[in-house]
Amino acid sequence: GVWPVDSGRICIDGKDVTALPEYKRAAYLGRVFQDPMTGTAANMQIEENLALAARRSGKRGLRWEVTKEEREKYKKLLTSLNLGLEDRLTAKVGLLSGGQRQALTLVMATLVKPKLLLLDEHTAALDPKTAAKVLEITDKVIAENRLTAIMVTHNMADAIKHGNRLIMMNNGKIIFDVSGEEKKNLTVDDLLRKFSENAGESFSDDRAMLG
């Protein structure tokens, strides 16, 4: 959903987007949601989903078929994921596992390079092994495309391991902000202690203990 701004401004790549309607702000963003079913069209083929994502910022016409050039591009992209999807381009997305769908959604969200990639607990619905694979793919896609990304997570181990800056929030306010070597050297126990010190309460979400 969209939360109204009651103070300050939102700037993306130097442009003030605070007052823009949601559909215009969306042009700056790539998004992967928590629910693996959300980011793809289940009844469409893998290559059709990718084509929709690739054409979202271009001029729309009557052409619909996936071209040979597009198909080769998608095959190359999917091969790099090591999930076997490159050989299933004409398969319906609804036949994929949750992890495969999240990986596909991630590729779709970055086909047209966004100014900002938003990852909204995008591994929370996955089992630990699949979540680790999707996070590995996430790191790869972000690095290769040199993207700016914000990953929301309750998993403190993942927050420490991934990204170059960690911001801890409570009740809508920043209570801890760390980056660089200090972030790399953190442990989950350190973060739990920081939360208790700065929020004045104990952390109650068991998902933060994972890892």
Predicted stretch roles:
Residues 8-15, 176-178:
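Conserved ABC transporter NBD signature motif
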Residues 16-30, 60-67, 184-189:
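ABC ATPase NBD coupling module
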Residues 117-120:
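Catalytic Walker B motif of ABC-type/P-loop ATPase nucleotide-binding domains
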Residues 153-154:
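H-loop/switch region of ABC-family ATPase nucleotide-binding domains
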